[in-house]
Amino acid sequence: MRALGAVVTLLLWGQLFAAELGNDAMDFEDDSCPKPPEIANGYVEHLVRYRCRQFYRLRTEGDGVYTLNDEKQWVNTAAGEKLPECEAVCGKPKHPVVQVQRIIGGSMDAKGSFPWQAKMISRHGLTTGATLISDQWLLTTAKNLFLNHSETASAKDIAPTLTLYVGKNQLVEIEKVVLHPNHSVVDIGLIKLKQRVLVTERVMPICLPSKDYVAPGRVGYLSGWGRNVNFRFTERFKYVMLPVADQDKCVVHYENSTVPEKKNFTSPVGVQPILNEHTFCVGLSRYQEDTCYGDAGSAFAIHDMEEDTWXAAGILSFDKSCAVAEYGVYVRATDLKDWVQETMAKK
């Protein structure tokens, strides 16, 4: 009673749910899963297929289909007994922001368009930004992490003083912070969460870039809370669309600064940003709406239309511009990718 090609497939939905077929894996005497009927000159082959929840994708060496062998082990032809994993999707917001007109400026209603945006509260209640890049790690600036700490503070000292929210005010616990080994020049730090967050339409990482998106004139988006032009903290989430600026003009604008940030009252904002090979500038003409204090650590998000994916071209480092200065300064994400991936893999 066997026939080649007659196959029964059990579809196991969810985030890697295991097959539970009772003591005898061949026994289908169950009301919810009746034993399949036999056919002439054929047989029933038992298969399971692993699939992932919405906003996750299957990572496996094979195709996710496992067959029960003679030793009653579930095996895949390519992966053997090694099970697949469900990894979080990045850069695929359910409600992406749409550029409906050629206007550079800000909006007060993001409608879940930037699910990677996190809000970080440092000591003494200062609000800054952070960017979700996986279901357990975020990027922010080293300056954000050191707010109200001395320069000698360690990562262990800093972590307990931070409060972090993702999604719609979802409080998450921080396990540790990791500073870039050259953070006085590369203004970046990583935050690891104690638990992985569930990825939803409201909480989703942004992708690290596979290419350089920062050609002058390229338009991207920055989101956050920050301050308005009156330097008051805002309670409403907002975003702004801005172009990548010409780097030479940005350097000239900030008095040719190539040293770490310092007080300089000839600068339009009274302080000099870090400008080096690891940074790029974003902005437009004077007196237009721009980012304000509190948005540092947020991603400059660019939509890759070929891949239909959003990637973080950079992380905002210098954010004291508001409407009085032309340019914000960002750390290039392409320069961070190797360090970020190595750090996440070993920690």
Swiss-Prot record:
Membrane-crossing residue ranges in chain numbering: none
Sushi domain segment(s): 31-88
GO terms (BP aspect): acute-phase response; defense response to bacterium; immune system process
UniProt cross-references to SMART domains, sorted A to Z: Tryp_SPc
Residue ranges of domain Peptidase S1 in the record: 103-345
GO MF assignments: antioxidant activity; hemoglobin binding
PROSITE patterns for the chain: SUSHI (PS50923), TRYPSIN_DOM (PS50240)
Region (Interaction with CD163), start-end ranges: 259-264
One Pfam entry name: Trypsin
InterPro entries: Haptoglobin, Peptidase_S1_PA, Peptidase_S1_PA_chymotrypsin, Peptidase_S1A, Sushi/SCR/CCP_sf, Sushi_SCR_CCP_dom, Trypsin_dom
Entry keyword set: Acute phase, Antibiotic, Antimicrobial, Antioxidant, Disulfide bond, Glycoprotein, Hemoglobin-binding, Immunity, Secreted, Serine protease homolog, Signal, Sushi
Disulfide bonds: C52-C86, C90-C207, C250-C281, C292-C322
Main localization of the protein described in the UniProt heading: secreted
Residues carrying a glycan: N148, N182, N256, N264
Signal peptide start and end residues: 1-18
Compartments, record wording: Secreted
Cellular component GO terms, alphabetical: blood microparticle
Tissue specificity statement from the Swiss-Prot or TrEMBL entry: Expressed by the liver and secreted in plasma.
Role description: As a result of hemolysis, hemoglobin is found to accumulate in the kidney and is secreted in the urine. Haptoglobin captures, and combines with free plasma hemoglobin to allow hepatic recycling of heme iron and to prevent kidney damage. Haptoglobin also acts as an antioxidant, has antibacterial activity and plays a role in modulating many aspects of the acute phase response. Hemoglobin/haptoglobin complexes are rapidly cleared by the macrophage CD163 scavenger receptor expressed on the surface of liver Kupfer cells through an endocytic lysosomal degradation pathway.
Stated family: Belongs to the peptidase S1 family.
Binding partners and assembly: Tetramer of two alpha and two beta chains; disulfide-linked. The hemoglobin/haptoglobin complex is composed of a haptoglobin dimer bound to two hemoglobin alpha-beta dimers. Interacts with CD163. Interacts with ERGIC3.
Domain notes from UniProt: The beta chain mediates most of the interactions with both subunits of hemoglobin, while the alpha chain forms the homodimeric interface.
Protein name, per record: Haptoglobin
Annotated organism of origin: Mus saxicola (Brown spiny mouse)
